[in-house]
Design a protein with these regions (language model features):
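Primarily a LysM-type cell-wall glycan-binding module
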Residues: 49-83
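Extracellular LysM carbohydrate-binding repeats and other cell-envelope/extracellular binding modules
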Residues: 30-56, 81-119
């Protein structure tokens, strides 16, 4: 009888194929797994605005219609708890005047810290004057008519004159400022500040800072008295320090030892501040360097004494990252025309921060 025998390896292959077919057949009969049921959708939280007679108050903003008697200041006081933020409402809505019936949006948070934006950053010009005259001008003397024209230019072109404290709060990230902010300063104790500049500043409602050096404060003549300084101090003129004698703080006299020089510096910045405090009953926090000069020793002494900041006469505007003890100031000379004045008012920079 004839027998056909498969090689052993073919026999194994045949058995493996048969087992695989049986296994696949068994898998095909299993039920497909069912997907897990999706969780039910969460209900959407509907935030209902608070509705008043003239406004809808949302978490991040207020939508309202201006009513008779409303002003930017009154709305800022009501919704932002600060009437000095009137400019913010005006700038956000891109309007200058407010009339009954106007629709307004008031954001309840101000995001642009330090004046930073996608396009660049805000800069604050600090302008400086020395003397004033009714009928003549020179490098350090501005004619009354020119000063009036410059202050009117600020008003008509949307600039906001801010106080020194507001400026430093901006540098410290404590508050925003209007886009076209400017600080006005005057150096020295000349009577023309009271006679000419002070009435013009009052006319436009502008604050200013007057830096005085105390050795020059003498009753009568061409300089200011403490009585006149006290009068101005009560009406938006912030009296601050220009040292005691107006000496250059960076230069040691040839006959001074270093100890004598250091003691003289302390008198210049500390004793003068104490005199102003005693005479006017006010805080002295800012100093203008005589001739605009400073060094590390002087700056360290100012910090130790308690000054918040100090000013040079370097031309240029000031971003939030400026050294607060080397603030730029642009001198306004008596030879300037209105275009020169305008060029000193740089309020924005599109330079890339690195």
């Amino acid at each position: 009888m004839f027998y056909f025998r498969l090689p052993f390896y073919l026999y194994c292959l045949f058995v493996f194929a048969a087992l695989l077919m049986v296994s696949c057949a068994g898998l095909s009969t299993r039920p497909e797994p069912q997907p897990f049921p999706s969780p039910p959708p969460e209900p959407q939280l509907q935030i209902q605005p608070e509705v008043t007679a003239d406004a809808r108050i949302f978490p991040d903003f207020v939508a309202l219609i201006a009513q008779p008697g409303d002003t930017f200041s009154s709305l800022a006081s009501k919704y932002l708890n600060d009437p000095s933020l009137d400019w913010f409402i005006a700038e956000f809505n891109e309007i200058t005047f407010l009339s009954p019936g106007q629709e307004l949006i008031i954001p309840l948070q101000i995001e642009e810290k330090g004046g930073l934006s996608l396009k660049g950053y805000q800069t604050i010009p600090v302008i400086s004057y020395h003397k004033f005259s009714k009928d003549k001008s020179d490098a350090l003397t501005v004619k009354e008519s020119a000063f009036e024209e410059q202050m009117r230019f600020l008003k008509e072109n949307g600039y906001r004159v801010i106080t020194m404290d507001q400026f430093f709060d901006f540098l410290d990230f404590k508050r925003p400022l209007p886009k076209k902010s400017v600080v006005i300063t005057i150096d020295d104790d000349w009577f023309s500040t009271y006679e000419i500049a002070f009435p013009v500043l009052k006319k436009y409602g502008y604050p200013a800072t007057l830096f005085v050096y105390t050795d020059l404060i003498i009753p009568g003549g061409k300089t200011l008295s403490w009585d006149l300084l006290a009068e101005m101090s009560k009406k938006n003129m912030d009296i601050q320090c220009h040292t005691k004698s107006h000496r250059n703080l960076t230069k040691r006299n040839s006959q001074e030892s270093f100890r004598e020089y250091f003691e003289a510096l302390k008198k210049e910045v500390a004793e003068s501040a104490e005199i102003i405090r005693r005479q006017l009953n006010k805080d002295v926090k800012y100093l203008a360097y005589p001739y605009g000069d400073a060094n590390h020793l002087v700056v360290s002494l100012l910090k130790k004494v308690g000054y918040r900041g100090a000013f040079t006469v370097e031309r240029g505007s000031n971003p939030f990252f400026i050294d607060p003890y080397r603030i730029n100031r642009s001198m306004i000379f008596g030879t300037f025309n209105l275009k020169d004045f305008e060029n000193s008012l740089v309020t924005f920079s599109d330079k890339e921060l690195r």
